[in-house]
Each structure stands twice: as structure tokens, then as C-alpha cells.
A protein has these predicted regions:
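Short acidic catalytic loops
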Residues: 1-2, 178-179
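Active-site-facing alpha/beta catalytic cores
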Residues: 3-174
């Protein structure tokens, strides 16, 4: 971090939720004992303890938010968040991104398409109102101001990586056209 700190911020990727295409382990928060017991309270405690440990090392932490309730429990410890390729087209996740209090990267679709993430960026950067959880833990109407730090993450797709110069230029042109 000392060497690159003026141009690059290194963060620890700490993913607690596992998006599933079909079935399987859903991650530390949902199943910390890896046995299907779904001890959510234990998983949330473990996630917070791990994040506090990372922060105690002086390293910012990042995660992918999958369940829209999870940010209420760990967002205060997260410096950068992601909305994944499997959820970028979800209205729920776009609305959630609009209210996150940290920069959020929205990934292109699993097939590599950019239009879904461009649509998601427009939604995430604008005010939203939706059914959610208040700071007091009560179901309520949540209103956001939009996330001015929402941005695109090129994560590749069916045709391979998309972080080469041509792919980045295409993404940039599509973003400029959408504005």
C-alpha cells in the first residue's frame, strides 16, 4: 500500500454470501458451520469479527452484497461493495445499491453483456424508494438519494475476459451514450 497508495487502493476481498446458479453452500453468513444448519446469528457475528480483524490490520474491506438485508449488519465495516453478475438485473439489488454508503461496483452480466449493467448504473445512481429494513431493524419504506460512486466492473463473460483496451473503449462509449 505504501508503494502504490497515491494511485491505487488495495482492499481485502471478503465475500460472505455465495450466489448460487442452482443449489449449494450459500456462504459463511447463512451457514457458518458448513453443515446446512443455517445458523444466521453465528454467521453474522463471525462476519463482523472477521471484518473487524481486517480493519484492525489497516486494510479496507470489500464484499459482494447478495441478500438485501445483509448491509444492515455489516455495511459499517465495508469500504467497497459489489453487485454481482447474477443479480445486476435485479430491481431489488439496483435499489439497494442506490442506498449503500460506499462506492459500489456493478458487474456486467454473466454472458458478458453490458446493457444490463448500464441500466443498473442508471438506477443505482438515482434516488429510489422501496420496501426495506430501517436502521432500527423494522420493515419500512426506505428512500435513498442515489449512489454517486456507482461504477461498472468488467468481469468477463462467455467469450472470455473483457478488460482489454477495445472492450474498455466499447464500455466507455456505451456509458457516455447512456448519459
Amino acid at each position: 500500500r505504501d508503494e502504490l497508495g497515491d494511485t491505487l487502493e488495495l482492499v481485502m476481498r471478503v465475500y460472505f454470501e455465495k450466489p448460487r446458479t442452482s443449489i449449494g453452500w450459500k456462504g459463511l453468513i447463512m451457514d457458518p458451520d458448513l453443515d446446512g444448519s443455517d445458523n444466521l446469528a453465528k454467521g453474522l457475528r463471525m462476519a463482523r469479527q472477521l471484518l473487524c480483524g481486517v480493519l484492525d490490520l489497516g486494510v479496507p474491506a470489500s464484499t459482494e452484497f447478495l441478500d438485501p438485508i445483509t448491509p444492515q449488519y455489516i455495511a459499517d465495516l465495508i469500504s467497497w461493495a459489489a453487485i454481482g453478475a447474477r443479480t445486476v438485473e435485479s430491481q431489488t439489488h439496483r435499489q439497494m445499491a442506490s442506498g449503500l454508503s460506499m462506492p459500489v461496483g456493478l458487474k456486467n452480466a454473466t454472458n458478458g453483456a453490458l446493457t444490463p449493467v448500464i441500466n443498473a448504473l442508471q438506477a443505482a445512481s438515482h434516488p429510489q424508494t422501496f420496501f426495506g429494513i430501517s436502521a432500527e431493524g423494522v420493515a419500512s419504506l426506505v428512500s435513498t438519494t442515489g449512489n454517486p460512486s456507482a461504477h461498472m466492473v468488467l468481469r468477463g463473460g462467455e467469450d472470455g475476459p473483457n478488460y482489454d483496451a477495445d472492450s474498455v473503449a466499447t464500455a466507455r462509449a456505451m456509458l457516455e451514450k447512456a448519459d
